[in-house]
Amino acid sequence: MEERSKIRVGITHGDMNGVGYEVILKAFSDPTMFELCMPIVYGSPKVAAYHRKALNLQTNFSIINSAEEAQNDKLNILSCTDDELKVELGKPTEEAGKAALDALEKALSDYRDGLIDVLVTAPINKHTIQSESFHFPGHTEYIEERVGGGNKALMILLK
């Protein structure tokens, strides 16, 4: 019998100046996470490396250019932002809002194209993400409009 492929989980990096990368990097520092899924982080390898160093973590990741390149047993980082982003931890910036929206749009496109099975979103700043193409109270409403179909699912897990 052929082994079932792991679920392909798209994870947006959220506000790059917030807790998104910390949560992602710490979660995937546990190798058992890779038994559950194939993670594809939509964001910036440069920003991920910045957070990894700031948090003194050893979490390894692979840089990919498309979701099709993702590999099992690796934290795959799909670059979908400008490489010259400036991280300012804890500070709301327009640049962070644009990076959050860029990651969300790419992840939703890949979801619609069947390249990822589910989407997990890191927290965004609801003020800095506002732009000409984003006039929503938050990204949940944005996702609902973009994906459509009348099927709504939202899960919030807290520990």
Protein language model regions, located:
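Anion-binding alpha/beta catalytic cores of soluble intermediary-metabolism enzymes, centered on
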Residues: 1-159
